């Protein structure tokens, strides 16, 4: 199975990344597809298998949006990909 980072995984599913947040232990993105805006989030990267979800949103500032869908990894798996996202190593105060 081929590996992709979080941002490239979203693009591989046919979305255009509009806004990307690269946090210490998480990543999130707003992306569009077929005139619909979506919010993607990969949870705590300190975990061996972090949780990935997406939901429909109304704007690039809508962090509450609709219901979470956890089908991102399954859709990628069907295409022969999996997400491998490394944490920031420098200044990661949560890892002490």
Where are these regions (language model features)?
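A sequence-composition feature that detects small, non-aromatic residues
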Residues: 9, 28-31, 84
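Acidic, low-complexity, intrinsically disordered interaction modules
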Residues: 19-78
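Charge-rich, solvent-exposed alpha-helical interaction surfaces
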Residues: 9-13, 75-82
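Negatively charged, low-complexity tracts enriched in Asp/Glu with abundant Ser/Thr
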Residues: 1-24
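Short acidic DE-rich linear segments
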Residues: 87-96
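Short, surface-exposed acidic
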Residues: 19-20, 83-86
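Residue-identity detector for threonine
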Residues: 3, 64-67, 86
């Amino acid at each position: 199975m081929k590996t992709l980072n979080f941002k490239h995984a979203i693009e591989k599913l046919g979305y255009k990344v509009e806004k990307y947040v690269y946090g210490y232990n998480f990543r999130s993105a707003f992306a569009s597809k077929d005139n619909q805006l979506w919010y993607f989030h990969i949870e705590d990267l300190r975990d061996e298998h972090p949780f990935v979800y997406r939901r429909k949103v109304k704007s690039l500032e809508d962090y509450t949006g609709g219901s979470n869908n956890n089908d991102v990894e399954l859709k990628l798996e069907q295409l022969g990909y999996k997400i491998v996202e490394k944490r920031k190593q420098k200044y990661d105060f949560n890892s002490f």
